[in-house]
Amino acid sequence: MEVTQMTSPIHNYSEIGKLKTVLLKRPGREIENFTPDMMPRLLFDDIPYLPIAQKEHDYFADTLRDNGVEVLYLEKLSAEALDAGGEEVRNHFLEQMLTESGYAAGSIHDALKEYLGSMNNQDMVVKIMEGVRKNELDFVPKDLVSCAENQDYEFYMDPMPNLYFTRDPSACIGDGLSINHMTFVARQRESLFNETIIKYHPRFANKGIHVWRDRNHTTRIEGGDELVLNNHVMAIGVSQRTSADAIQDIAKNLFKDGQYDTVIAIKIPHNHAMMHLDTVFTMINYDQFTVHPGILGKGGQIDTWTITPGKNEGELNLQHDTDLKKVLKTALNLDDLDLIPTGNGDPIIAGREQWNDGSNTLAIAPGVVVTYNRNYVSNELLRKHGLKVLEVISSELSRGRGGPRCMSCPIVREDLKK
């Protein structure tokens, strides 16, 4: 079947359809505007060297463009959305950002609002992203908390170094998206940018876009756990960053609309190295997947639950299984499939290359993937399995613990030919 006409600004019905439009965030000062002491707080393991990280990210973006992909940037769309929304939207955005930064009211709130409010929208967005240090404001707080408890902390508003992982704050599913309540405080403000873009940017506003789950929840879900396997099946990781109750929420909403009828929940280890499903498992062709051997138990077992609509609206049926290959073959109606092990299954190589995002491949067409060049064992294995591998440079970007899939939020893909 030929590609269907795309009338919605969001059209993403698979992990592997030819990528047409993607959302990126070019690394800015936020990735170096912190100290080693702040790394645990900001969920980072290292501090990238910004000039090289930017060159690497530009190479990544150019690789996508060279393959026919339209590249949009979060920082630009955010400012354009505020421009389009006018003063009321700008004020609401700033108030919400200050509230979520810990300043719903008070003298610090007022000082920050005056400082940020004096900027144009583009400069304000960039400054919020890179963080606001105390020495930037001509202001001395008088409250006891600031004077007695937080006097040695350098920031009023923390930087957001994880923003270049645009996969996580939102996930485009079908003709809609989830705008995610993220797990850790360090990242929870990020999805406010996505919400603002969807509501007010002329490209997306008032276009009938489904919001499958908004950010105003207490249960956690992140886009790295959300895999759109085809036009009616999703896989979602039960992980450090995504909870089972959030998966049930989004499944009910998808089923109610009728676009999707199956969600496969896959339980992975709850740790930093394997924070999302896409750090250990990705779809790269109709019948091919990467998988990190470290998530599989004896005999290749892993807990999965296939969720389908129940008899009554809002009810869910669950089918537990530990044979991932069988579950995928059944859900995707495949006779067989190819699970390609990270690092060729070698325990040392697999562990090293998974840490450097060897499992985090981005498919830009069926059988065509973008990977980090540093994971040479996994890359060569992919080629031996018939895939076209486009390597991108990665010495600094990889320090953030995310690969090509993490750094990209597909907005439009061509439909798969049936």
From Swiss-Prot:
GO terms for cellular component: cytoplasm. Keywords: Arginine metabolism, Cytoplasm, Hydrolase. Pathway: Amino-acid degradation; L-arginine degradation via ADI pathway; carbamoyl phosphate from L-arginine: step 1/2. It holds the Pfam family ADI. GO terms for molecular function: arginine deiminase activity. SUPFAM superfamilies: Pentein. It comes from the Bacteria. It catalyses: L-arginine + H2O = L-citrulline + NH4(+). It is found in: Cytoplasm. The active site is at C406 (amidino-cysteine intermediate). It is an enzyme of class 3 (hydrolase). Disulfide bonds: none annotated. InterPro entries: Arg_deiminase. GO terms for biological process: arginine catabolic process to ornithine; arginine deiminase pathway. Its EC number is 3.5.3.6. Belongs to the arginine deiminase family. HAMAP family: Arg_deiminase (MF_00242). This is Arginine deiminase.
